[in-house]
Structures are given as structure tokens and as C-alpha cells.
Regions:
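Bergerat-fold GHKL ATPase/HATPase_c domain
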Residues: 1-54
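Conserved ATP-binding N-box helix of the HATPase_c
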Residues: 46-70
């Protein structure tokens, strides 16, 4: 848990949800809908919600394309009135399915305030490499 997680976890009004879907591009719409709803409930503007949706779409698509067959994508969303943090994870067939020099990563980096990618060693029980992308978007005070 990094400092932004602790700040959100300590908030009295934090909203948290976990969702698991099949690692299938057709399921990304469900993730977008959940994240959008959480962000709207937390009081983010329509533009901020759109940025969150785009970042989540890029992260989920990247991991789904690298996921092993018949696997699941996990998504954790935590939000309060100041920020939203989303972590998406999947078991991938490659050690590093994330192209940090690619356009999608550049987009995520541009529209979020904090972006990380974690790669774990091969997990024999899961049959692949656990990979996660996490990002935080801070609500802008207008």
C-alpha cells in the first residue's frame, strides 16, 4: 500500500469496489461502467470521469491482449472526493505485455497523476506472469 492508498483508505467517505471479469475485450464495457459510476458518486467532473474511463480502457485492453487463455481480469477501484485509484491485474503469458513506449501508455501517463506497472515472476500455479497496472487520478479543484 503506497501513500496514496493510505490517504484514500483513511478517508471517511471512500468508496471501494472489486470486480472480476473474463479476460475478454467484450467485457471491458463492464469495467468502464463500474469505474464511471464510482467516479461520479465521488463527485468527479464529466471530463475527469472521461479521463478515468480512457485510462481504464487502455490498461484493461493491454492486459487482456496479454492474458493467458481462459483467465480473469481483476479490477480494484477506490475513490473519495479527492482522488480515484484503479488497479487492473491479469495473469499474462509474457513477462512484460506492457509497451511503455507505446501510444496507449503515453495516453495513460498523460491523463493520470500516478501510473505504475508491476510484473511478478512466473507463477506455476497460475500458469503465467501476474501483471498489474495501477493509476491514480486526483480531482482538480476548480
Amino acid at each position: 500500500m503506497d501513500s496514496s492508498d493510505r490517504i484514500i483508505a483513511d478517508s471517511i467517505h471512500a468508496t471501494s469496489i472489486q470486480i472480476q471479469i473474463d479476460a475478454d475485450l467484450g467485457q471491458v464495457v463492464m469495467l468502464r461502467a463500474v469505474a464511471e459510476t464510482v467516479a461520479l458518486i465521488a463527485g468527479f467532473t464529466v471530463d475527469e470521469v472521461a479521463d478515468t474511463r480512457v485510462a481504464l480502457d487502455e490498461a484493461a485492453t493491454c492486459l487482456i491482449l496479454g492474458a493467458i487463455p481462459d483467465s480473469q481480469l481483476h479490477c480494484d477501484v477506490v475513490a473519495d472526493s479527492f482522488r480515484i485509484r484503479i488497479e487492473v491485474g491479469a495473469v499474462c503469458g509474457d513477462t512484460d505485455p506492457i509497451d511503455t513506449a507505446g501510444f496507449g501508455w503515453h495516453v495513460m501517463h498523460s491523463i493520470t497523476d500516478h501510473l505504475t506497472a508491476d510484473h511478478d515472476p512466473y507463477d506455476r500455479a497460475q500458469g503465467g506472469y501476474p501483471v498489474a497496472i495501477a493509476f491514480t487520478q486526483v480531482r482538480r479543484v476548480h
